[in-house]
């Protein structure tokens, strides 16, 4: 029996009525994962034994009728710590790391009765935009296995889009939830910085990282955010949760809402069919009663340059701990302490990770700090101020999630700058700490196009409201890839 076409609420009703058990649902999910895994490579670890133990305990305790996520399987990105389950960040450096604790987001999900069924593939240490830098091999796009799934949360997106799981967790440092959500035709939200605790997330860029949910629909995405969002004393940057229920505005109309469309988001480098899709979406919002007007975010063009200085500098610091002594892989060919450090890091890290560590170390080095890192921080402030000016007059910002649809595997691996530019529309949101969502908005060349909605801090309720209004009146979310069982 398969349940991949059932919504979370439908699954909840089946569990409460005892038509199925949590164990049966978990077993069916594990079978879904295994049957599609050879085609996708979306998982690093399938946690079958642990998941079935969890499911049995939930069945014995009884499904919580008031908790819609009780007994629901969950896939977790492999840089989010899971007690007793390998957490490798898709790196040789952490090939044998098994945490003895859960990340707060995972602990929160388990408290709601969710069952962790496995750890999803990703770009190594979340550094990459295509899902190809993983030590465990590239993940494939759910719609076309010759295309990239996006990154860095490649496996989490492909797993949901293909029907392996209904819900998954990812992390977003410069677009790593929204871009793969767009490439795979599902819903991915990067919450306001601090909404979801970073405790237990293997750090990349600490001022940018945020854990967030993937789901096939807007409401299911919001239900998962309800479960994982919390203030956390273990994360000094976490913020009080200001929204009791992220689904509360879903279903309300959007008449009179003001939506900004930045001219920079439809300019040079944007695929013409993607641009046309977003302009059509803008017209659709107007039909729903919203007011859509063109605005300018003049400093957004510097976002990629600013991001790669700041994120790489933070990564250079965060990844110092992986040295073959305190953490991680240790080279066997070392004859002294210096060689242990050098050889372990040279062999344990992949090329993209080493590239970013070098860039970050250079940016922070004496004589270059003011010219690079300090300057990047100043321009980051200008990007934040651009957003603040727009949000003084508008409720949300609309634009494409990515400049193009999913591209061929191995087509940009040898051109890091081109790969970095694929995140030019998502990066500014992280630099400003804002929430942003990607939802399906159409197709180009048979591949999904993602629409991005950006809001001021702590506006997730409004983002979900507007996203759900679009979803309910278009139906793009109902189209599924062949591997799911739908029509491509």
UniProtKB/Swiss-Prot annotation:
Keyword match Protein biosynthesis: yes
Assigned GO CC terms: glutamyl-tRNA(Gln) amidotransferase complex
Assigned keywords, A-Z: ATP-binding, Ligase, Nucleotide-binding, Protein biosynthesis
Keyword Protein transport recorded: no
Organism superkingdom: Bacteria
EC code: 6.3.5.7
GO MF entry, a single one: glutaminyl-tRNA synthase (glutamine-hydrolyzing) activity
Catalytic machinery residues: 77 (charge relay system), 152 (charge relay system), 176 (acyl-ester intermediate)
A Pfam family annotated for this UniProt entry: Amidase
Coiled coil: none
Alphabetical list of InterPro entries matching this protein: Amidase, Amidase_CS, Amidase_dom, AS_sf, GatA
PROSITE patterns according to UniProt: AMIDASES
Catalytic activity: L-glutamyl-tRNA(Gln) + L-glutamine + ATP + H2O = L-glutaminyl-tRNA(Gln) + L-glutamate + ADP + phosphate + H(+)
Binding partners and assembly: Heterotrimer of A, B and C subunits.
Database matches in NCBIfam families: gatA
Family: Belongs to the amidase family. GatA subfamily.
Name of the featured protein: Glutamyl-tRNA(Gln) amidotransferase subunit A
Biological source species: Streptococcus pneumoniae (strain Taiwan19F-14)
Record lineage: Bacteria, Bacillati, Bacillota, Bacilli, Lactobacillales
